[in-house]
């Protein structure tokens, strides 16, 4: 089977699953765990009290003590590659995120657009009955796709998340943030 045939088959199966999931009510298996992923930019591995660091984070400590501590993950020095690797389970270059989205180029591994052949974790969870949400900074969408007019096919709600509330780019104004609820602009009071 050629790579085209494999890709076409995988894409057809994914579409069939998505269509079936709308007809058949998919629920998580009995006893399935809740999944909460917290990514904090610019904080070193050993900084939080959960990992023996000096920053006291009692809520995170409580969550970590009753769950899984993810401590075997490669992070990069910038956020976009780390985010896309965490949310896909794949190396950042496989995800075409060699740097932050604003510095994307046409070079392989650095286009700033996750290939359709890499399934986002949220989509895998959704197809297994989980409800998914993304809140806060996204910074996984190529800079030329960050606009209320779209395209929005690489935004969180088109990558498996049922709910998104936050900002798409790498930064926003702290006093008058440019926020989205899904793909709709949030009007400031």
For the regions a language model picked out, list residue spans one by one.
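Formylglycine-dependent sulfatase
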Residues: 1-189
């Amino acid at each position: 089977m050629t790579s085209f045939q494999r890709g076409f088959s995988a894409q057809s199966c994914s579409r069939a699953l998505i269509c079936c999931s709308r007809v058949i009510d998919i629920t998580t298996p009995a006893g399935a765990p809740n999944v909460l992923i917290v990514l904090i930019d610019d904080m070193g591995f050993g900084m939080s009290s959960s990992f023996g660091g000096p920053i006291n984070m009692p809520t995170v400590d409580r969550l970590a003590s009753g769950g899984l501590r993810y401590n075997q993950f490669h992070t990069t020095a910038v956020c976009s590659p780390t985010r896309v690797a965490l949310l896909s389970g794949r190396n950042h270059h496989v995800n075409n995120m060699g740097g932050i989205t604003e510095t994307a180029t046409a070079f392989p591994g650095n286009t700033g657009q996750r290939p359709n052949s890499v399934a986002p974790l949220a989509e895998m969870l959704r197809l297994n009955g989980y409800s998914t949400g993304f809140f806060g900074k996204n910074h996984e969408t190529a800079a030329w796709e960050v606009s209320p007019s779209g395209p929005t096919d690489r935004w969180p709600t088109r990558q498996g998340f049922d709910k998104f509330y936050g900002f798409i780019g790498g930064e926003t104004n702290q006093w008058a943030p440019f926020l989205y609820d899904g793909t709709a602009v949030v009007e400031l009071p």
